[in-house]
């Protein structure tokens, strides 16, 4: 919650903040635990969500947030130590349980999306997707059947689907051993399915279009992953890729999906913003 003007639409409500605050590492309180943190965590998190949602540059958030170098330092720290991924994965389990599912999925879907990049993106990390006529980067995602993210991998757009899919499929195999089958479109057919079966011991099934199909139709079993791509691209920072590092692009996507999940988990509850939140959470 912003301290000025009642907050911004991208700010977390207190109910949403209560879901994520236990998942952050304990705040440093000094003197032996490191330098005491000057800015409340919720101001840092709200500033990150503001950047993700509005697409503003790191150096240009409103002045009522923490200074931008501080916000960016936390963004990088939480990326490097795995905090963002842990928060994302914990919330995904809660969303699945709220939907009456087991926290761990048994099936998945994979797809890719090519997006344009800003001029500041290094040439070595972008390329040209000849099929989609896009110069930029390609996002590979694996989701569960609800469309919740299991793995994300960002590469140059010139990488073929059959090559770029191997790493997210491997991550899914390692992090979610219960996933036995993954559905994909025809762009992933061929030797990738053979590799998945031989190396990962999993079934990659291609969902083919009906030969009588005319125009756009939602494909059975694949609509969820296609919808998932709309979640990050609704955030202006992700409408194109601005990040110097592909790994930071992956983290930006996770932040966007975290925002989607906390809103889903608090849907129907009255949103309240009663005042300052504590800097330090109590750790048993």
List each model region and its residues.
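Short alpha-helical elements
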Residues: 1-284
């Amino acid at each position: 919650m912003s301290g000025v003007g009642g907050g911004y639409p991208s700010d977390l409500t207190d109910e949403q903040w209560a879901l994520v605050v236990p998942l952050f590492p304990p705040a440093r309180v000094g003197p032996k635990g490191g330098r005491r943190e000057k800015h409340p965590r919720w101001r840092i998190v709200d500033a990150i969500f503001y950047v993700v949602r509005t697409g503003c540059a790191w150096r240009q958030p409103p002045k009522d947030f923490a200074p931008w170098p501080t916000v960016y330092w936390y963004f990088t720290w939480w990326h490097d130590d795995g905090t963002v991924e842990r928060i994302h994965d914990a919330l995904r389990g809660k969303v699945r349980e709220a939907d009456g599912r087991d926290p761990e999925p048994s099936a998945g879907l994979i797809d890719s999306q090519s997006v344009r990049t800003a001029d500041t993106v290094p040439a070595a990390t972008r390329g040209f997707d000849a099929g989609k006529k896009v110069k930029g980067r390609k996002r590979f995602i694996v989701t569960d059947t609800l469309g919740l993210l299991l793995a994300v991998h960002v590469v140059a757009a010139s990488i073929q689907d059959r090559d770029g899919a191997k790493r997210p499929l491997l991550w899914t195999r390692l992090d979610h051993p219960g996933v036995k089958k993954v559905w994909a479109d025809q762009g992933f057919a061929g030797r990738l399915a053979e590799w998945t079966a031989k190396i990962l011991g999993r079934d990659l099934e291609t969902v083919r279009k009906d030969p009588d199909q005319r125009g756009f139709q939602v494909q059975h079993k694949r609509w969820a992953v296609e919808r998932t791509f709309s979640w990050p691209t609704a955030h202006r920072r992700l409408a194109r890729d601005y990040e110097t590092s592909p790994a930071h692009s992956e983290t930006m996507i996770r932040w966007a999906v975290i925002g989607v999940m906390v809103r889903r988990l608090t849907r129907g509850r009255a949103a309240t913003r009663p005042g300052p939140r504590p800097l330090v959470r109590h750790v048993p």
